[in-house]
Each structure stands twice: as structure tokens, then as C-alpha cells.
UniProtKB/Swiss-Prot annotation:
Pathway: Purine metabolism; IMP biosynthesis via de novo pathway; 5-amino-1-(5-phospho-D-ribosyl)imidazole from N(2)-formyl-N(1)-(5-phospho-D-ribosyl)glycinamide: step 2/2. Signal peptide: none annotated. It comes from Methanobrevibacter smithii (strain ATCC 35061 / DSM 861 / OCM 144 / PS). GO terms for biological process: 'de novo' IMP biosynthetic process; adenine biosynthetic process. SUPFAM superfamilies: PurM C-terminal domain-like, PurM N-terminal domain-like. Its EC number is 6.3.3.1. Gene3D superfamilies: PurM-like C-terminal domain (3.90.650.10), PurM-like, N-terminal domain (3.30.1330.10). This is Phosphoribosylformylglycinamidine cyclo-ligase. It is an enzyme of class 6 (ligase). The gene is purM. It catalyses: 2-formamido-N(1)-(5-O-phospho-beta-D-ribosyl)acetamidine + ATP = 5-amino-1-(5-phospho-beta-D-ribosyl)imidazole + ADP + phosphate + H(+). One of its GO terms (molecular function) is phosphoribosylamine-glycine ligase activity.
């Protein structure tokens, strides 16, 4: 049985670490009018009748896949996506980003490829990359790491934190295009270390290789979600489904649960990972399993929201909000997992 912790990532220890950091940093919040808790997707700072949304994230160990394939022109898209998709989750439209590239040794050609992806992601998201930092850190960094910090703006009266979520609301799931940028330590262990696949091996039931599926850039959700903002729908919550899978929904509101009973067919890459002795409970806790973003709204508003979304992406109602605080997911095998 292969788990995330066995692949070198201890989610529970990460949570304790983040908690200790946050408890110390909390003392600085008194200097500004902060709206969101530190555990939300993006922080909000009030400026009069508007708020700045800020979020920071990186590409993670997906970079190792880029190195295996000697292909660096898409990891910049991942960097942009991981930041802007989080900013959307508080109702804000992303507007700008700064990047951080840490390298073992400078490599101008690789940096140019990385920049191509950053530009592609920025143009698709309609944001400006206004600066950044490149640091040479031999002895600290192996190869390179890439991260970004983004900002967005939102009117204070249009902020979406999840506080309006209530039992009976419906979950609209927007499809992912694969793994996106989370769970790669588990994927690499299951597929390469344990099963012995290579990046050039063909995917079952697909015309692509395993490497091509793993390097596929993270979906950008700016256009469809901003389209919802402009229509001023009654949106109760927004969730970017990243590391932690559907347990990310707990970041929105305490005291509610979620019954996820109608997911689209899981992409083949997830089925291949599962076949390498990874438990279903672990799969749905680590990966997005085919849903990259969730919109939570009341039942009456759902159809109108989906009509707008379908101009940009594939979506469907995947579940509902409950009042028992559990998250239950019906898996592609027909069984249920509960968190």
C-alpha cells in the first residue's frame, strides 16, 4: 500500500508546522484591517470600500517531472495558476504577480523557457507580472524552485469567504485536466519508484505518454470565475481543489459538511496511480480526482451559474452541503470514502 507519507510528504506534520507559524505571525495582524483567517485561500486587507487579496504558492515537486522530460515551458503556467486560482476563492479578480526563481546555478536557456510559461499563464489570466527575484543558492537548492505571489482586488461588499454556506446548498464542480500541481511525490513513488514506469511509457486508453499527462499544466479558472463575478450571482463559496483534495472545502466554513455523490469520470492518470496499490481514501485526500474548482450556491441559482460556466469549461452539480461536518465522496469504484 502506497501513501503520501511513505512518499516523503507528511500532511499531518505540515499542518502542525503551519499552525505554529501562523500562531506566531498572528501578532502582526493588528497593524492592518485583515478580513480573512490565515487558513483561507487568500488573505484580504481592507482599503476603504475595497480589499486587496494576496496569495503565494509554488509549483512543488512537479518541477522534477519537468527535469525528467527536459521541458520547462509549462511550469510557469502552473506557478501562475496556483496563485490566481486561490485569489479567486475570496471573490477577487487577480491583477498582478511577482515571481521567485531560486536556482542551484544560473541557466539562461532554462530561465527563458520558464519565462515563456509565466507569460502564457499571465496572458490567459489577464494579469501583469510586475517584478520578481532570482536567487542563486548552491548548497541550498537542487536544480531550481519556482513560486509566485499575486494580488487581486474586490469590493468589500462582494467578498466571498464561505460564511454564507448552509446545508442544502449545491456544489458545482468544474473539471480539472489532470493532476494539476499537487500530489507529485505520491505519483512519482507509485508510478516510477514502485511500478517501474518511465515517462515515455504510453498511458492506458490514451494517446499520450505518462510524462505528457504528468507535465500537463494546471487549469486556469480566471475567465470562467470572473465571468460569474460580473453576473453578480449569489455565490456562497469558492474552492480551488489542490493538495488535500476535497478536504479543502473545510477551509471555507466550520460546522458544515459535504456529500459529493456525482463526480465526472476520473482522468486516466488517477486510475493508473490507483492501480499501483494506492488506497482510494488516499487518492481522494491527495488529488483533485477530476474536479479542479468548486462553486457553492443555492439550488435556485445553480442552473444559471452553470449556463455561464459552460461557455468556458465543463461543469456539473457534484454534491450538496450537509450539516454533519463530514465530507463523503462517492469514488469512481462506486464505494464511499469519508473524511
Amino acid at each position: 500500500m502506497v501513501t503520501y507519507s511513505e512518499s516523503g510528504v507528511d500532511i499531518d506534520l505540515e499542518a502542525v508546522t503551519v499552525s505554529k507559524l501562523a500562531s506566531k505571525l498572528k501578532s502582526t495582524l493588528e497593524y492592518r484591517d485583515i478580513i480573512t483567517d490565515s487558513g483561507h485561500y487568500a488573505a484580504l486587507v481592507r482599503l476603504g470600500d475595497k480589499a486587496i487579496a494576496m496569495s503565494t504558492d509554488g509549483v512543488g515537486s512537479k518541477i522534477l517531472i519537468a527535469e525528467m522530460m527536459n521541458k520547462y515551458d509549462t511550469v510557469g503556467i502552473d506557478c501562475i495558476a496556483m496563485v490566481v486560482n486561490d485569489i479567486l476563492c475570496v471573490g477577487a479578480e487577480p491583477i498582478a504577480l511577482v515571481d521567485y526563481l531560486a536556482v542551484e546555478q544560473p541557466d539562461p536557456e532554462r530561465a527563458e523557457e520558464i519565462a515563456e510559461g509565466l507569460v502564457t499563464g499571465a496572458k490567459e489570466s489577464r494579469i501583469s507580472i510586475i517584478g520578481g527575484e532570482t536567487a542563486s543558492l548552491p548548497g541550498i537548492i537542487k536544480d531550481f524552485d519556482l513560486a509566485g505571489t499575486g494580488i487581486g482586488f474586490v469590493d468589500v461588499d462582494k467578498i466571498i469567504t464561505g460564511e454564507d454556506i448552509e446545508a442544502g446548498d449545491v456544489l458545482i464542480g468544474i473539471e480539472s485536466n489532470g493532476i494539476h500541481s499537487n500530489g507529485y511525490s505520491l505519483a512519482r513513488k507509485a508510478l516510477f519508484d514502485d511500478a517501474g514506469f518511465s515517462i515515455d511509457d504510453k498511458m492506458p486508453n490514451c494517446d499520450t505518454t505518462i510524462g505528457e499527462e504528468l507535465i500537463r499544466p494546471t487549469e486556469l479558472y480566471v475567465k470562467p470565475i470572473v465571468a460569474l463575478f460580473k453576473e453578480e450571482y449569489d455565490i456562497h463559496g469558492l474552492a480551488h481543489i489542490t493538495g488535500g483534495g476535497f478536504t479543502n472545502l473545510r477551509r471555507l466554513k466550520k460546522g458544515v459538511g459535504y456529500d459529493i455523490y456525482d463526480l465526472p469520470e476520473a482522468p486516466e492518470i488517477f486510475k493508473l496511480i490507483y492501480q499501483q496499490n494506492v488506497p482510494l481514501e488516499e487518492m481522494y485526500k491527495v488529488f483533485n480526482m477530476g474536479i479542479g474548482f468548486v462553486v457553492i450556491t443555492n439550488e435556485n441559482e445553480a442552473e444559471k451559474i452553470m449556463e455561464t460556466l459552460k461557455d468556458y469549461c465543463n461543469c456539473q452539480i457534484i454534491g450538496k452541503v450537509t450539516d454533519d461536518e463530514k465530507i463523503t465522496v462517492k469514488t469512481f469504484e462506486g464505494s464511499e470514502v469519508t473524511y
